[in-house]
Design a protein with these regions (language model features):
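Rhodanese-like catalytic fold shared by cysteine-dependent sulfurtransferases
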Residues: 1-34, 41-81, 90-145
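Short, surface-exposed ligand- or partner-binding patches at beta-edge/loop junctions that are enriched
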Residues: 85-86
Length: 145
């Protein structure tokens, strides 16, 4: 048998992170950290989201936040403080470690994910926000006639 288990990969990823709890994440976000929701649309539709979070689905995260990528977002910068969250805090740990691999040394994740945020009584919303890719390609509404 070759390779490592997902549990081993997750444990290794987390050794590199200083994971933030919900209240620490909220304070960091208020201080300018980028809060990034990487959950798929079905989870966001069912459970809601966090006001002010940027929605970047997991499959394009590295391309949007790598400062060297042609498809990067304007916010992408090596000094950017990024807090990634998923539903329960597993996928977000892997994603934050991947961002660190790209050189975003301030990347981390929300310990416990959206579930922990909501349980802490922090603000949430129930509407489904577009991803950064959808927002960039959605034409503005037509003016009323």
């Amino acid at each position: 048998m070759t390779g490592r288990s997902i549990d081993a990969i997750l444990a290794e990823a987390r050794t590199r992170l200083r994971r933030l709890g919900p209240h620490e994440s909220a304070a960091a976000h208020r201080s300018g950290a980028l809060l990034v929701d990487i959950r798929p649309v079905a989870q966001r539709a069912e459970h809601g989201g966090i006001p002010g979070a940027l929605v970047i689905e997991r499959n394009v995260l590295e391309w949007r936040l790598d400062p060297r990528a042609d498809s990067r977002l304007p916010e992408a910068d090596f000094g950017l403080r990024v807090i990634v969250y998923c539903q329960e805090g597993y996928t977000s740990s892997l994603a934050a470690a991947a961002l660190q691999d790209l050189g975003l040394t301030e990347a981390t994740d929300l310990d416990g994910g959206y579930v922990a945020w909501r349980a802490a009584g922090l603000p949430t919303h129930d509407d489904v926000r577009p991803t950064v890719d959808q927002a960039a390609t959605t034409p503005p509404p037509h003016p009323a006639r």
